[in-house]
């Protein structure tokens, strides 16, 4: 299987969920073995962020990558939904030029990003696609009962369970398993929106968070249930969105993962902690390619320009 980039550049603009800052984002094709590289083009000189687990420095309600320049922290927040879409489509190499400190939230899911990527077209490249294959179990947990682990599996399977004491959540909608392929990702999780509790908004805004949030780009929950007039896109949209987030957070590894991911009450911090634990143990994984055989993960073939 070959590496993939975009066939053409494409632009999007929007508002950041937490900062409320407007930004223009340009996705541009990149050469083989470049990886995914975010670029703050509003900075002089331009600040580059080649994705890796170590670049994630803040995980309060979103995944934020940070570089230092002239003793100043330069950030890009809320990258997880775009990273999730890139993983879903199977993009290996891409420059992401952005004019502010947060990726636009769009509708709160990954569906707008997938539309952008498919509109630009997918270009196959003359190099083998690399995968990270899990060889042994790696597990992390936190003091709040959150657990995340990798284990060997021929494919990419995600098991996620959440636990919220709230009327909008019920037991039948708090667990989900996704056997990853592009088709399954598009159909099962790409449209699931981020969510938040109305009671927390005042506190968040005091911390300069949630400044761009609204019912047009998130699911709002009050003490009785969902506030959005249109309701949920799926009964279990909450756990579907958690899987969407996890797919994006785990793609910070730099390559698709072949293995099983199991999580309970995990979030951006624990997802990143798991990736760091994985790369810290060279015996836990290997980088593999599939030149003469089909990989255990299937990517859609639509919009591919050879």
From Swiss-Prot:
Catalytic activity: a UDP-3-O-[(3R)-3-hydroxyacyl]-N-acetyl-alpha-D-glucosamine + H2O = a UDP-3-O-[(3R)-3-hydroxyacyl]-alpha-D-glucosamine + acetate
Record SUPFAM superfamilies: Ribosomal protein S5 domain 2-like (SSF54211)
GO cellular component: membrane
Enzyme Commission code(s) on record: 3.5.1.108
Function in brief: Catalyzes the hydrolysis of UDP-3-O-myristoyl-N-acetylglucosamine to form UDP-3-O-myristoylglucosamine and acetate, the committed step in lipid A biosynthesis.
Species of origin: Hydrogenovibrio crunogenus (strain DSM 25203 / XCL-2)
Keywords of this entry: Hydrolase, Lipid A biosynthesis, Lipid biosynthesis, Lipid metabolism, Metal-binding, Zinc
Lineage: Bacteria, Pseudomonadati, Pseudomonadota, Gammaproteobacteria, Thiotrichales
Family to which this protein belongs: Belongs to the LpxC family.
Name under which the protein is recorded: UDP-3-O-acyl-N-acetylglucosamine deacetylase
Cofactors demanded by this protein: Zn(2+)
Domain of life of the organism encoding this protein: Bacteria
Swiss-Prot/TrEMBL GO biological process terms: lipid A biosynthetic process
GO molecular function, one term: metal ion binding
Active site: 268
Coiled-coil boundaries: none
A Pfam family per the record: LpxC
């Amino acid at each position: 299987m070959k590496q993939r980039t975009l066939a053409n550049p494409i632009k999007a603009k929007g508002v950041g969920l937490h900062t409320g800052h407007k930004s223009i984002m340009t996705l541009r094709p990149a050469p083989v073995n470049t990886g995914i590289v975010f670029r703050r083009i509003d900075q002089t000189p331009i600040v580059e962020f080649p994705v890796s687990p170590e670049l994630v420095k803040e995980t309060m309600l979103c995944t934020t990558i940070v570089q230092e320049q002239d003793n100043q922290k330069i950030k890009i927040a809320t990258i997880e939904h775009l990273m999730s879409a890139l993983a879903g489509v199977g993009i290996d190499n891409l420059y992401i030029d952005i004019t502010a400190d947060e990726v636009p939230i769009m509708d709160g899911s990954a569906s707008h990003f997938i539309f952008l990527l498919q509109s630009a077209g997918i270009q196959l490249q003359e190099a083998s696609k690399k995968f990270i294959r899990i060889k042994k179990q790696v597990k992390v947990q936190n003091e709040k009962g959150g657990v995340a682990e990798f284990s060997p599996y021929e494919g990419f399977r995600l098991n996620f369970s959440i636990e919220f004491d709230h009327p909008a959540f019920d037991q039948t909608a708090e667990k989900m398993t996704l056997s990853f392929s592009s088709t399954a990702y598009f159909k099962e999780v790409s449209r699931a929106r981020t969510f938040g509790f109305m009671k927390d908004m005042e506190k968040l805004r005091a911390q300069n968070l949630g400044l761009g949030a609204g019912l047009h780009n998130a699911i709002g929950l009050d003490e009785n249930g969902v506030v959005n007039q249109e309701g949920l896109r799926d009964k279990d949209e909450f756990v579907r969105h958690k899987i969407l987030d996890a797919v994006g957070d785990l793609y910070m590894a730099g390559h698709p993962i072949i293995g099983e991911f199991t999580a309970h009450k995990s979030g951006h911090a624990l997802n990143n902690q798991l990736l760091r634990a994985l790369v810290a143990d060279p015996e836990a994984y290997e980088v593999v390619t599939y030149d003469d055989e089909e990989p255990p993960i299937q990517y859609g073939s639509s919009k591919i320009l050879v």
